[in-house]
Amino acid sequence: MSTIKDLNLAPSGERKIRWVEAHMPVLRDIGSDFAREKPFAGLKIALSVHLEAKTAYLCRVLEMGGAEMHVTGSNPLSTQDDVAAALAAKGMDVHAVYGCTDEEYQAHLRSVLSVGPNIIIDDGGDLVHLMHTEFTDLIPQVIGGCEETTTGIHRLRIMDRAGTLRFPMIMVNDADCKHLFDNRYGTGQSVWDGIMRTTNLVVAGKYVVVSGYGWCGKGVALRAKGLGAKVIVTEVDPIRALEAVMDGYEVMPMMDAAAIGVIFVSVTGCKDVITLEHCERMKDGAIVSNAGHFNVEIDMEALDRCADEIYEARHNIDAYRLPNGKTIYVIAQGRLVNLAAGDGHPAEIMDMSFAVQAMSAEYLVRTRGQLKPGVVSVPAEIDDNIARRKLKAMGVSIDSLSCSQKEYLNG
């Protein structure tokens, strides 16, 4: 039996799913293939991804392929209750409620793992971690899994180096059709959508501090610049810092940037990027947000412990009045700003990311028993297939190499 907020919310969620389906042509095309070929017939898939409409459509595409789906969210504040209800109303096993406690969140993860999945689709690594700590007896029946995020892949690589990862995990985030588009264009747009709809403040003319200049940070900085902000980048990697300088941004240590910025976006995948000491240096009224996976980039524990007063300033914005008299505003409790305070990436972008997930899951079944435990790259042919499908859907044609050109390039 599903664990959701209210089944009566299903019609609203169904409308959302139909909308994204109309704007995800590649995934729709793959769904048609799956419906015909049934690659997942007789298999159980456990999925933990931010549970909103685009994820719901991915679940339905996998179900078209014959999978028995067991679904939960990957963040308590990103679940959309109406979408969860829409899936449950059609008979899918769903365990996700917006705003659930950490204990309830863990219970939801356990619910989808307890069925004994054959494939795991993860976002941040929580399912895989729990499988290796509490459900080890079920590991032999796991064919493999797919990981969506930079943070999750980081956790998997640690396990892989330690020799503790006991089944193959495909690094979906590292696929070109994922990180070059989802991380840069998707994050860039959705982060500012979340910040602007939550604060209702202008970005133009303000100093924006972007912590981290990976693909996600590049996207956030680019869109901030396009909105008229004066962008400062903080980094620990000298190569990325140099990239930011060459891209026209100011680069400085976080302690220096803290005294200048008005809006802060942490997008590193690391912990304690914005600390209490940084917050104490910020201007009165500074706005702090996180676009990394977990709510550890901002030291929320220190803020909760040291603030003289904490109150809700606006829906999804908490005010922290510090002992020095300044008030700092934190969006969505320091959780993912684009999902906890918005609808996540545009459907057209997630069309490619979730196409990689779907085709990678099918690849796991097709190569069952051939892949060794550990992290596995997305095959180049999957990237190529998805890119060609996307171009076709967009009505874009490209050239192809002639025989003589191929001979020249191949020696």
Where are these regions (language model features)?
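Glycine-rich phosphate/diphosphate-binding loop of Rossmann-like nucleotide-binding domains
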Residues: 49-67, 178, 182, 186-261, ...
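Glycine/serine-rich phosphate-binding loop and adjoining beta1-alpha1 elements at the start
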Residues: 2-40, 71-79, 84-206
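A short helix->loop->beta-strand "cap" motif at the edges of active sites that frequently abuts
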Residues: 66-68, 92, 138-140, 167, ...
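Alpha-helix C-terminal capping/helix-to-coil transition sites in glycosyltransferase folds
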Residues: 115-116, 259-260, 281-284
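ADP-ribose/adenylate-binding Rossmann-like module
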Residues: 73, 120-123, 136-151, 270, ...
